[in-house]
């Protein structure tokens, strides 16, 4: 089997990435890329920064050329709008037409939701920070390969304020908590 070609879409603005670096961290896309290369030795991993004005895919690449796409978290909020948000929605909307598998974490889930026709809002229950507690797999989640070996109820590190209010047509919920989908 040939090595996979993967795309990581950085959800943060250049300012947020610079702030992470100034505190000794790395941009989310760097962390994702490093982890993917560790889990899949030999994988080719590209990074795209659609929050940046003028950002493009690496030379010679198209979304159809990837075996998978991962979208990071972000400090942005979809309901605040703006060019950085719109560019990401447009890119993901295009990615959805390719049939390439997409994985979205937090912001990534929100961008995929909106690009596919769903609605995201600020959670009326407030921010969840630290650990999401009591995350429950649905029947579909228990059958999904991503959750093989996972407990039916688990905790996971989390920081988010927003939630999916309305699922896009055809979406399937794999897991949820009492606070957020």
Which residues fall in each region the model found?
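N-terminal beta1-alpha1 cap of cysteine-dependent amidohydrolase-like domains
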Residues: 1-87, 94-98
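Conserved beta-strand segments of alpha/beta enzyme cores
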Residues: 44-46, 119, 155, 172
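Short gly/ser/thr-rich secondary-structure transition/capping motifs
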Residues: 47-56, 137, 156, 175
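Cysteine-nucleophile active-site neighborhood
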Residues: 74-141
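Short, glycine-/aromatic-enriched active-site segment of Class I SAM-dependent methyltransferases
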Residues: 142-149
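Anionic-ligand binding region
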Residues: 161, 171
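Conserved binding/recognition cores within well-folded domains
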Residues: 168
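Conserved small/polar residues in nucleotide/adenosyl-binding loops
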Residues: 179-181
């Amino acid at each position: 089997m040939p090595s996979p070609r993967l795309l990581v879409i950085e959800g943060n603005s250049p300012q947020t990435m610079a702030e992470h670096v100034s505190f000794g961290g790395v941009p989310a896309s760097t962390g994702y890329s490093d982890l993917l290369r560790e889990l899949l030795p030999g994988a080719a991993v590209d990074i795209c920064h659609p929050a940046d004005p003028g950002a493009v895919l690496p030379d010679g690449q198209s979304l159809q050329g990837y075996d998978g796409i991962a979208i990071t978290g972000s400090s942005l909020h979809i309901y605040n709008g703006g060019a950085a948000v719109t560019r990401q929605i447009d890119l993901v909307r295009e990615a959805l037409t390719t049939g390439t598998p997409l994985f979205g974490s937090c912001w990534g889930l929100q961008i995929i939701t909106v690009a596919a026709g769903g609605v995201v809002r600020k959670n009326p229950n407030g921010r969840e920070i630290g650990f999401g507690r009591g995350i429950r797999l649905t029947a579909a989640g228990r059958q999904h390969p991503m959750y093989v070996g996972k407990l039916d109820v688990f905790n996971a590190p989390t920081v988010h304020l927003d939630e999916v209010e309305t699922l896009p047509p055809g979406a399937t919920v794999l897991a949820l908590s009492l606070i957020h989908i």
